[in-house]
């Protein structure tokens, strides 16, 4: 494959509870749970006093998440929180790409027609979210004077190639997360990251890290073995890379 990926895979369920859950705000990321096959956390989003979404999320090496196990994880988590599940309202399941490395030129050789979003490789390399880049691409296309399949393809490819170059630092961090240690220890990387200043974290999610931000992320004692981190950075095609 032209791109090597990890994945943020999830199963989410919206439940009607038999009594109020007691939450006054979302629980964005509860990583105190058993890590299982990779970095795992549970996200809880209340919609009303007695309805909420519980999402079991895993940063894992392939897109396939064992659905039955994730559903049991949700039931177990609800029980631990004291939430009494009454009626399942809906379920969602998906996998977002996490870019490790790749050959963007080879990737685009497979595309004869204009494309956007995930098919164009236009997503945040660490979160997998595509909306901000979709908006930026729409702004770029709005400036075009001539609309043909060829000009659209060329413009989108140029835009995607520029984004790819700008995301090199993020891909390096992704390789440290996925390749520099055991899967069930990935939480250590995330724990250190979320201890950084709030403004830096916001710029990270926006894909707008400054040079001081990058230096701050890399400074201090690394959360993974130094040699393993260097191998992940310098040799992304090593054995542990995605197949």
Task: Tell what function each PLM region has.
Residues 91-95, 100, 118:
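Catalytic cores of enzymes that engage adenine nucleotides and/or redox cofactors via long glycine-rich
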Residues 142-243:
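C-terminal helical "tail/cap" subdomain of flavin- and related membrane-associated enzymes
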């Amino acid at each position: 494959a032209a791109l090597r990926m990890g994945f943020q895979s999830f199963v989410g369920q919206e439940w009607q509870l038999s009594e109020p859950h007691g939450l006054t705000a979302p629980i964005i990321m509860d990583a105190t749970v058993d890590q299982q096959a990779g970095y795992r956390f549970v996200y809880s989003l209340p919609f009303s006093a007695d309805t909420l979404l519980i999402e079991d999320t895993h940063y894992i090496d392939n897109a396939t998440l064992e659905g039955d196990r994730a559903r049991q994880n949700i039931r177990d988590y609800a029980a631990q929180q004291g939430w009494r599940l009454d009626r399942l309202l809906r379920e969602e399941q998906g996998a977002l790409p996490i870019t490790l490395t790749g050959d963007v030129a080879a990737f685009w050789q497979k595309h004869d027609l204009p494309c956007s979003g995930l098919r164009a490789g236009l997503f945040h390399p660490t979160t997998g979210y595509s909306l901000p880049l979709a908006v930026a691409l729409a702004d770029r296309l709005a400036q075009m004077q001539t609309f043909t399949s060829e000009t659209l393809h060329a413009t989108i490819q140029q835009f995607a190639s520029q984004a790819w170059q700008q995301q090199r630092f993020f891909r390096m961090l992704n390789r440290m997360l996925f390749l520099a240690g055991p899967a069930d220890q990935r939480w250590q990387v995330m724990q250190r990251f979320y201890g950084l200043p709030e403004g830096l974290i916001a710029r990270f999610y926006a894909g707008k890290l400054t040079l001081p931000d990058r230096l701050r992320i890399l400074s201090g004692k690394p959360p993974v073995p130094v040699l393993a981190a260097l191998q992940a950075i310098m040799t992304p095609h090593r054995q542990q890379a995605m197949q």
